[in-house]
């Protein structure tokens, strides 16, 4: 198997030390976060430019830029993610190694209640509580000892059967069936409410500073979205998320135009309700998006993320996944934590099956970021099976990577 390691891949992405002075830091009127801006570029947009074209030079700058990107992603494709509602309560029970967390959230006279089973490790509870993995629709990856698992019924929060699922689910029972939020945004809302109540439920013995999220396929898209928009998530693990996940819209279109049979934006909006209805207005003109999913993943930085893709399934957009995460990696690099971002792309297994020979890569991220152990997380690899389509970084990335000052 031929692996291409990150040290080779990012030669086209030089790191530039930029001046300490930042005009954005001097602005007293705050951070402008419009939901849409004039834009047109076939290349992957520079995540290190503010909406007005000035450069991001510091971590303080990035905090504003992150807000801008989050607003744009909601404005174009995700719909509005509402803040914590005034009512968020819970009950928790446990019998042996099995617990149940019930969350009630909403407004006076209009709440919804959902429950999640929790499986706890055997052994003595750590002083700060167990690390927790939130698994969309159930667990599809192996986990090391010492991590609790909460099974999240995200489809109850935002239904995802087909286009008839628009506005259906417990989130929409609270916010209205015409709410702009996509199903994936609704899922993020549910994850946030789970974390809200765990923070004030000591009986659950969960370390809320060590919460991870994962999911596969459509749920992998959701896990990535949760990691991007919920900053209390300590580790994000999308598995085979494909189009609308850790791939980029522009690159998937390129694959399709090159003769590969992949899922691109024009098709995905007809399949389900993972994106807002507003996204329909842009899927035939992707170049007007002032971001792509390298920037969606970049919202997670500097928090850790590792994603997995499967080249046996062409429709997952293998070149797009690799290229998109190659373009995302400089965001962690600019913050001085490149080993907080990993990517693994192999084949020879079924969709959502996790090959055991990949366990060391996954466990390294669990060990380092949830269990507090020493581990090497410099992991970025592909088998380069792109079905004849050629990845050329200079075709898509015409920006350089700054070193963001503190």
Swiss-Prot record:
<feature type="glycosylation site" description="N-linked (GlcNAc...) asparagine">
    <location>
        <position position="285"/>
    </location>
</feature>
<dbReference type="Pfam" id="PF22244">
    <property type="entry name" value="GCE_fung"/>
</dbReference>
<feature type="active site" description="Nucleophile">
    <location>
        <position position="217"/>
    </location>
</feature>
<feature type="glycosylation site" description="N-linked (GlcNAc...) asparagine">
    <location>
        <position position="100"/>
    </location>
</feature>
<dbReference type="GO" id="GO:0046274">
    <property type="term" value="P:lignin catabolic process"/>
</dbReference>
<keyword id="KW-0719">Serine esterase</keyword>
<keyword id="KW-0439">Lignin degradation</keyword>
<feature type="disulfide bond">
    <location>
        <begin position="31"/>
        <end position="64"/>
    </location>
</feature>
<keyword id="KW-0964">Secreted</keyword>
<feature type="binding site">
    <location>
        <position position="315"/>
    </location>
    <ligand>
        <name>substrate</name>
    </ligand>
</feature>
<feature type="signal peptide">
    <location>
        <begin position="1"/>
        <end position="17"/>
    </location>
</feature>
<feature type="disulfide bond">
    <location>
        <begin position="248"/>
        <end position="324"/>
    </location>
</feature>
<dbReference type="GO" id="GO:0005576">
    <property type="term" value="C:extracellular region"/>
</dbReference>
<feature type="glycosylation site" description="N-linked (GlcNAc...) asparagine">
    <location>
        <position position="122"/>
    </location>
</feature>
<comment type="similarity">
    <text>Belongs to the carbohydrate esterase 15 (CE15) family.</text>
</comment>
<feature type="binding site">
    <location>
        <position position="221"/>
    </location>
    <ligand>
        <name>substrate</name>
    </ligand>
</feature>
<feature type="disulfide bond">
    <location>
        <begin position="216"/>
        <end position="352"/>
    </location>
</feature>
<keyword id="KW-0732">Signal</keyword>
<feature type="binding site">
    <location>
        <position position="263"/>
    </location>
    <ligand>
        <name>substrate</name>
    </ligand>
</feature>
<dbReference type="InterPro" id="IPR054579">
    <property type="entry name" value="GCE-like_dom"/>
</dbReference>
<comment type="function">
    <text>Glucuronoyl esterase which may play a significant role in biomass degradation, as it is considered to disconnect hemicellulose from lignin through the hydrolysis of the ester bond between 4-O-methyl-D-glucuronic acid residues of glucuronoxylans and aromatic alcohols of lignin.</text>
</comment>
<dbReference type="InterPro" id="IPR029058">
    <property type="entry name" value="AB_hydrolase_fold"/>
</dbReference>
<keyword id="KW-1015">Disulfide bond</keyword>
<keyword id="KW-0325">Glycoprotein</keyword>
<feature type="glycosylation site" description="N-linked (GlcNAc...) asparagine">
    <location>
        <position position="376"/>
    </location>
</feature>
<feature type="short sequence motif" description="GXSYXG catalytic site motif">
    <location>
        <begin position="215"/>
        <end position="220"/>
    </location>
</feature>
<feature type="glycosylation site" description="N-linked (GlcNAc...) asparagine">
    <location>
        <position position="398"/>
    </location>
</feature>
<feature type="glycosylation site" description="N-linked (GlcNAc...) asparagine">
    <location>
        <position position="110"/>
    </location>
</feature>
<feature type="active site" description="Proton donor/acceptor">
    <location>
        <position position="351"/>
    </location>
</feature>
<keyword id="KW-0378">Hydrolase</keyword>
<protein>
    <recommendedName>
        <fullName>4-O-methyl-glucuronoyl methylesterase</fullName>
        <ecNumber>3.1.1.117</ecNumber>
    </recommendedName>
</protein>
<feature type="glycosylation site" description="N-linked (GlcNAc...) asparagine">
    <location>
        <position position="348"/>
    </location>
</feature>
<feature type="binding site">
    <location>
        <position position="271"/>
    </location>
    <ligand>
        <name>substrate</name>
    </ligand>
</feature>
<dbReference type="GO" id="GO:0052689">
    <property type="term" value="F:carboxylic ester hydrolase activity"/>
</dbReference>
<feature type="glycosylation site" description="N-linked (GlcNAc...) asparagine">
    <location>
        <position position="178"/>
    </location>
</feature>
<feature type="glycosylation site" description="N-linked (GlcNAc...) asparagine">
    <location>
        <position position="387"/>
    </location>
</feature>
């Amino acid at each position: 198997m031929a692996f291409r390691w990150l040290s080779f891949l990012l030669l086209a992405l030089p790191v530039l030390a930029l001046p300490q002075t930042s005009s954005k830091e001097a602005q007293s009127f705050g951070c402008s976060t419009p939901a849409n801006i004039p834009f047109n570029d076939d290349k992957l947009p520079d995540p290190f430019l503010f909406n007005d074209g000035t450069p991001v030079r510091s971590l303080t700058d990035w905090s504003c830029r992150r807000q801008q990107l989050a607003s744009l992603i909601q404005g174009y494709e995700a719909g509005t993610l509402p803040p914590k509602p005034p009512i968020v309560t819970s009950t928790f029970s446990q019998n042996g190694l099995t617990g149940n967390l019930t969350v009630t959230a909403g407004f006076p006279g209009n709440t919804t209640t959902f429950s999640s089973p929790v499986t706890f490790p055997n052994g003595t509870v750590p002083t700060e509580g167990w690390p927790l993995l939130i698994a969309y629709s159930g667990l599809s990856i192996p986990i090391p000892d010492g991590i609790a698992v909460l099974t999240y019924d995200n489809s109850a929060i935002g239904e995802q059967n087909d286009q008839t699922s628009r506005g259906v689910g417990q989130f929409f029972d609270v916010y209205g069936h015409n709410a702009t939020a996509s199903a994936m945004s609704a899922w993020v809302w549910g994850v946030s409410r789970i974390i809200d109540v765990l923070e004030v439920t000591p009986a659950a013995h969960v370390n809320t500073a060590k919460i991870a999220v994962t999911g596969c396929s459509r749920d992998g898209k959701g896990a990535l979205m949760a990691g991007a928009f919920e900053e209390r998530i300590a580790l994000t693990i999308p598995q085979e998320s494909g189009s609308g996940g850790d791939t980029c819209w522009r690159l998937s279109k390129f694959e399709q135009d090159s003769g590969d049979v992949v899922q691109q934006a024009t098709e995905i909006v007809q399949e389900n309700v993972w994106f807002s209805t507003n996204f329909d207005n842009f899927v035939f003109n992707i170049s007007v998006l002032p971001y792509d999913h390298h920037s969606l993943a970049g919202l997670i930085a500097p928090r850790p993320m590792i994603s997995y893709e499967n080249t046996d399934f062409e429709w997952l957009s293998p070149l797009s996944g690799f290229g998109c995460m190659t373009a995302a990696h400089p965001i962690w690099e600019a913050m001085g934590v490149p080993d907080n971002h990993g990517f693994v792309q192999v084949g020879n297994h079924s969709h959502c099956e996790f090959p055991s020979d990949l366990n060391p890569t996954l466990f390294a991220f669990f060990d380092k970021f949830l269990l507090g152990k020493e581990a090497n997380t410099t992991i970025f690899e592909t088998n380069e099976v792109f079905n004849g389509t050629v990845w050329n970084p200079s075709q898509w990335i015409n920006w350089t990577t700054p070193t963001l000052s503190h």
